[in-house]
Amino acid sequence: MLSKRIIPCLDVRAGKTTKGIKFQNNVEIGDPVEMAKFYYEAGADELVFYDITASHEQRGIMIDVVKKVAETIFIPFSVGGGISTLEGMRAVLLAGAEKVSVNSAAVKNPDIIRQGSRAFGNQCVVLGMDVKHVGEKPGIASGYEIVINGGRSYTGMDAIAWALKAQDLGAGEICLNSIDADGTKDGYEINLTRLVSDAVDIPVIASGGAGTPAHLAHVLDQGRADAALIASMVHFGTYTVNQIKGYLHDHGVKVRKTW
């Protein structure tokens, strides 16, 4: 059995790391390059960066961050936010990222997944999914709907159906974020994670809601996720990565030993 991955997530706004709750009320918490170095040395298995104010004007700032991170750490990291073209993917990968994440852009143009996987390999293409629980309704059989544009726009797309389509198009991994749970520290959305993990054959990263090591143990076991994204619980010093890994190890979850 492969080790479960623990992945700190850094949201970057205009070159600075921020954190909010349910995509709102973001506060600045540090320099992304310094934080990347800290988490690398602290035992993280990977890192995820999201350019949350992605725009043409800000793109150069994020590329500069990616280059500096690639020079500083020696674990895989992915970058997402505002990447909507093959050229955008190429720029991020050439700057040093191992993976590129597409979210809203893939909903609007699903073929970007196919293009990216053919050009760079499916291991480089991560589908980011922002999901809200809306209950069963026509077109949303699972009760979970894909939302885009930072959670502001409902798409009418069922989360499970979209995950399966993206897998068929060539996505190599899914980062599954529950907006309902995001930043709450009340635990991951277990049912959603299990539904998606059971539906697809590619790795699923659970995101949104981590507050305690027990939450990670639950989503990696009962949610059947391959990896867990963490943010608030480590950004604000409540736990260290190695404390989390130690807890998981003690509770029967296989992790890469870094403590």
Curated annotation (Swiss-Prot):
Keywords: Amino-acid biosynthesis, Cytoplasm, Histidine biosynthesis, Lyase
Organism per entry: Desulforapulum autotrophicum (strain ATCC 43914 / DSM 3382 / VKM B-1955 / HRM2)
Chief location category: cytoplasm
Name the record gives this protein: Imidazole glycerol phosphate synthase subunit HisF
Pfam families in UniProt: His_biosynth
Amino-acid biosynthesis keyword on record: yes
Pathway given in the UniProt record: Amino-acid biosynthesis; L-histidine biosynthesis; L-histidine from 5-phospho-alpha-D-ribose 1-diphosphate: step 5/9
One Gene Ontology cellular component annotation held by this UniProt entry: cytoplasm
PANTHER family tied to this protein: IMIDAZOLE GLYCEROL PHOSPHATE SYNTHASE HISHF, IMIDAZOLE GLYCEROL PHOSPHATE SYNTHASE SUBUNIT HISF/H IGP SYNTHASE SUBUNIT HISF/H
Catalytic activity line of the entry: 5-[(5-phospho-1-deoxy-D-ribulos-1-ylimino)methylamino]-1-(5-phospho-beta-D-ribosyl)imidazole-4-carboxamide + L-glutamine = D-erythro-1-(imidazol-4-yl)glycerol 3-phosphate + 5-amino-1-(5-phospho-beta-D-ribosyl)imidazole-4-carboxamide + L-glutamate + H(+)
Keyword Transmembrane: no
Annotated EC: 4.3.2.10
Chain's role: IGPS catalyzes the conversion of PRFAR and glutamine to IGP, AICAR and glutamate. The HisF subunit catalyzes the cyclization activity that produces IGP and AICAR from PRFAR using the ammonia provided by the HisH subunit.
GO biological process: L-histidine biosynthetic process
CDD domains to which the protein is assigned, alphabetical: HisF
Active site, per annotation: 11, 130
Compartments reported by the entry: Cytoplasm
Similarity remark: Belongs to the HisA/HisF family.
NCBIfam families named among the record's database cross-references: hisF
GO molecular function list: imidazoleglycerol-phosphate synthase activity; lyase activity
The organism's taxonomic lineage, starting at the top: Bacteria, Pseudomonadati, Thermodesulfobacteriota, Desulfobacteria, Desulfobacterales
